[in-house]
Amino acid sequence: MKNRFLVLGLVAVVLVFVIIGLCIWLPTTSGKPDHVYSRAAVATDAKRCSEIGRDMLQEGGSVVDAAIASLLCMGLINAHSMGIGGGLFFTIYNSTTRKAEVINAREMAPRLANTSMFNNSKDSEEGGLSVAVPGEIRGYELAHQRHGRLPWARLFQPSIQLARHGFPVGKGLARALDKKRDIIEKTPALCEVFCRQGKVLQEGETVTMPKLADTLQILAQEGARAFYNGSLTAQIVKDIQEAGGIMTVEDLNNYRAEVIEHPMSIGLGDSTLYVPSAPLSGPVLILILNILKGYNFSPKSVATPEQKALTYHRIVEAFRFAYAKRTMLGDPKFVDVSQVIRNMSSEFYATQLRARITDETTHPTAYYEPEFYLPDDGGTAHLSVVSEDGSAVAATSTINLYFGSKVLSRVSGILFNDEMDDFSSPNFTNQFGVAPSPANFIKPGKQPLSSMCPSIIVDKDGKVRMVVGASGGTQITTSVALAIINSLWFGYDVKRAVEEPRLHNQLLPNTTTVEKNIDQVVTAGLKTRHHHTEVTPDFIAVVQAVVRTSGGWAAASDSRKGGEPAGY
């Protein structure tokens, strides 16, 4: 009998240990599997949109077909960040020709715009006057003409169905609705789409956009001309003018997207990074990386607490110097920024700035020599796509601040951008006493400066190594830089490269913002070096990336916005 109880007791003890072991082990091993695909990958900030891009690739579509179909979907599921009432940039890499190109479909100032048109920031953030000429659909058209394989109309069908039949409010849209609750509930056109019984929709509730579905159907059938010189044009102008805007039919008629056949590039070891130049922030990204590559970062740079603290201090100092020079950038068609860009892409110039970084301490703002002040830019969305043939697209799209101008057409369902707010105005001197940037003043037809930097990195054999970009306003450039540093230099896998807690400093204000879950070694090291740090209650930007590995294409969609990649 004793033996029997002894055996039962031993069995019970073993079972307890097994259960405890499972409880400890399961949470760490039953998370989402790594998203590694043998042939192709799509990383967007919404799972359904990644799947739509994947489906287009499986139908025999090109990497650009997949990108356009995914972007149309993102304009619904993350309508607060982007859509056909906004603009975008594509960075495209053709694996056959081994050439990179950029398509510029950024919004531009209407022809009646002028330098002093805004006397207060509210007018540049909300209402018809804040709307710049949208470029999104012209950008899709040009990209499809050059690289599309599937019929134009096919790319629209999944999003037409989503808009018409509805989809659940996701994490990103729910957060934006909560943040902008007051204005949405007070604006009938917005509340018609984004409210139920007068209150903003919650995560998981269904949103439908039947009027936008009709507009997408027209664009699918009639092409981009419907928007710019066709059946939709008069209504678009009417909607914007009735909201106080100055856009004309001629503004839409005359808008053209542009191919840039020689984007900016930088050598990173045996790899090359391609990124758009001004008015985007490619020069800023390149200057950050040029400064930092002189430190020869490696996994050892973050291996010990002391080394990690020093490494992140150096990274923040590079951010400060690069953002100081950003204040001199503008639309190169209107201002001569060639010397500024040459400096920002020069390794010699980066070496000079690196020599001014002191490992023991940071410095006051004036040390970094900011010339002017630039306004913060807003929301955006990004996708990264690689197709079976190894071609790639990085595309970043925006309507600027959450819900753009807050002007939503009750006829077409289009939500228009507030991109005029990205320009500088001579009527505003910022709170730091720094003058606004003349290079970014408003002129008719001019494009405002942006933090976007959709990037593609290829190896010495011309094969895509990494496709990366981000959304998140002024924090985009630093977040893309960190993802590249994490992947290429620190040796992190793509998921960790994207998910690793981030920090940001744009010099004005000279505050280093950190995410709340960042390693305390980093914040302690920054404080020791006299950084003014601040923990953000939110998060710093949203990154989408695809990286080539020995097992295939590893894709990561940032959990900060609830995205998920797809592939096959």
Swiss-Prot record:
The gene is Ggt1. This is Glutathione hydrolase 1 proenzyme. Keywords: Acyltransferase, Cell membrane, Disulfide bond, Glutathione biosynthesis, Glycoprotein, Hydrolase, Membrane, Protease, Sialic acid, Signal-anchor, Transferase, Transmembrane, Transmembrane helix, Zymogen. InterPro entries: GGT_CS, GGT_lsub_C, GGT_peptidase, GGT_ssub, Ntn_hydrolases_N. Cleaves the gamma-glutamyl bond of extracellular glutathione (gamma-Glu-Cys-Gly), glutathione conjugates (such as maresin conjugate (13R)-S-glutathionyl-(14S)-hydroxy-(4Z,7Z,9E,11E,16Z,19Z)-docosahexaenoate, MCTR1) and other gamma-glutamyl compounds (such as leukotriene C4, LTC4). The metabolism of glutathione by GGT1 releases free glutamate and the dipeptide cysteinyl-glycine, which is hydrolyzed to cysteine and glycine by dipeptidases. The active site is at residue 380. Heterodimer composed of the light and heavy chains. The active site is located in the light chain. Detected in adult kidney and mammary gland, and in fetal liver.
